[in-house]
Amino acid sequence: MEGLAVRLLRGSRLLRRNFPTCLSSWKIPPHVSKSSQSEALLNITNNGIHFAPLQTFTDEEMMIKSSVKKFAQEQIAPLVSTMDENSKMEKSVIQGLFQQGLMGIEVDPEYGGTGASFLSTVLVIEELAKVDASVAVFCEIQNTLINTLIRKHGTEEQKGTYLPQLTTEKVGSFCLSEAGAGSDSFALKTRADKEGDYYVLNGSKMWISSAEHAGLFLVMANVDPTIGYKGITSFLVDRDTPGLHIGKPENKLGLRASSTCPLTFENVKVPETNILGQIGHGYKYAIGSLNEGRIGIAAQMLGLAQGCFDYTIPYIKERIQFGKRLFDFQGLQHQVAHVATQLEAARLLTYNAARLLEAGKPFIKEASMAKYYASEIAGQTTSKCIEWMGGVGYTKDYPVEKYFRDAKIGTIYEGASNIQLNTIAKHIDAEY
């Protein structure tokens, strides 16, 4: 009878013969993927480059972060409850965003912008979201979608016309989603038919953020449905254009101060000069801007979760039950430590994606990771905070229930969580 060791050895040899080729020999150097992390590691190893911690900021970034924190606490915080209850953003808040230079963060000073970094935009959104996620997304859309698309793809005339307005007084709105085109956004049906020097738009849009206040709409419409998504083109449409109808704002669970409206286009004539970029490239522009926007949404969810956490911890340090603080119970301490660790992980994912974008490195996978994780953690954090505060956390007398309601949208808009997972998996497949 063969000994056990012999049988095991034979079994291991047989198993080894059926291993995937990537595991055929332990002597072969491990496969290095083409991910941005691997590239960064190789750069450090080969070139001796020193990288500062992700939470190291320039003096300008620190100044912006500090001033936005002060603005949010002093001018936005007192109005949050009223804006949420009335589903209306106060004009003073919108004016304050423009006056603070927060509606044109990356726009060149030549056009009235701040001329700051993309990470500055992320820090601004994070700080605003700590106080009100509605105000944060209002600022996020303007900066990461509207301004970015015009800066990158606009003609000199378009930039000269619209950027000075967008940095000082005019709100922009991004119009992609439709009733039958949500996650499958390129199934949109809005048409743009050429008539002389104009394009005539017909169709409808849904879930359009900031529509109630917008003076400029960046509209995706198809100039040739026979070629599918390759006919999608971007148009700049002014609010007062005849035939453009803005519907009643939706009555939403969260982000109630941020208007979300349906739009209808009935023979809306748009000059050919208002095409943004090239005809048929709208789908590329939309994908590119949404990839960047996902980092902005990650920052929004991160800030929201951190704001809720910051409000809750002082309460559980003061609340006495069974003769001691809630915070002194080890079971609760472990929950707090777990949530704090998740928040830090979400922050590092978000900042890393922003740094990669600024460095001109591939960032799409990292943006999806940041958006996915920050959104999921925001939901978990706000839920835990309500539990820790108990009954008072469940009432509208305290802001934690609003944080909880606001957090849910993170797993839905600018790419649902499952879409982010698809994107991440697609990149992993390509890397290996």
Swiss-Prot record:
Pfam families for this protein: Acyl-CoA_dh_1, Acyl-CoA_dh_M, Acyl-CoA_dh_N
GO cellular component: mitochondrial matrix; mitochondrion
EC number: 1.3.8.5
Active-site residues, Swiss-Prot/TrEMBL: 414
Superkingdom of origin organism: Eukaryota
Reactions it catalyzes: 2-methylbutanoyl-CoA + oxidized [electron-transfer flavoprotein] + H(+) = (2E)-2-methylbut-2-enoyl-CoA + reduced [electron-transfer flavoprotein]; (2S)-2-methylbutanoyl-CoA + oxidized [electron-transfer flavoprotein] + H(+) = (2E)-2-methylbut-2-enoyl-CoA + reduced [electron-transfer flavoprotein]; (2R)-2-methylbutanoyl-CoA + oxidized [electron-transfer flavoprotein] + H(+) = ethylacryloyl-CoA + reduced [electron-transfer flavoprotein]; butanoyl-CoA + oxidized [electron-transfer flavoprotein] + H(+) = (2E)-butenoyl-CoA + reduced [electron-transfer flavoprotein]
Modification N6-acetyllysine occurs at: 70, 284, 426
Segment annotated as transit peptide: 1-33
GO term, biological process aspect, one: isoleucine catabolic process
Entry's localization field: Mitochondrion matrix
Modified residues (N6-succinyllysine): 70, 284
Keywords: Acetylation, FAD, Fatty acid metabolism, Flavoprotein, Lipid metabolism, Mitochondrion, Oxidoreductase, Phosphoprotein, Transit peptide
Gene Ontology MF annotations: flavin adenine dinucleotide binding; identical protein binding; short-chain 2-methyl fatty acyl-CoA dehydrogenase activity; short-chain fatty acyl-CoA dehydrogenase activity
Chain sites annotated for binding FAD: 174-183, 207-209, 319, 330, 387-391, 416-418
Names of required cofactors: FAD
Complex formation: Homotetramer.
PANTHER family in the record: ACYL-COA DEHYDROGENASE, SHORT_BRANCHED CHAIN SPECIFIC ACYL-COA DEHYDROGENASE, MITOCHONDRIAL
Function, as annotated: Among the different mitochondrial acyl-CoA dehydrogenases, acts specifically on short and branched chain acyl-CoA derivatives such as (S)-2-methylbutyryl-CoA as well as short straight chain acyl-CoAs such as butyryl-CoA. Plays an important role in the metabolism of L-isoleucine by catalyzing the dehydrogenation of 2-methylbutyryl-CoA, one of the steps of the L-isoleucine catabolic pathway.
Family from the record: Belongs to the acyl-CoA dehydrogenase family.
Name of the protein: Short/branched chain specific acyl-CoA dehydrogenase, mitochondrial
Source organism: Pongo abelii
This protein's encoding gene: ACADSB
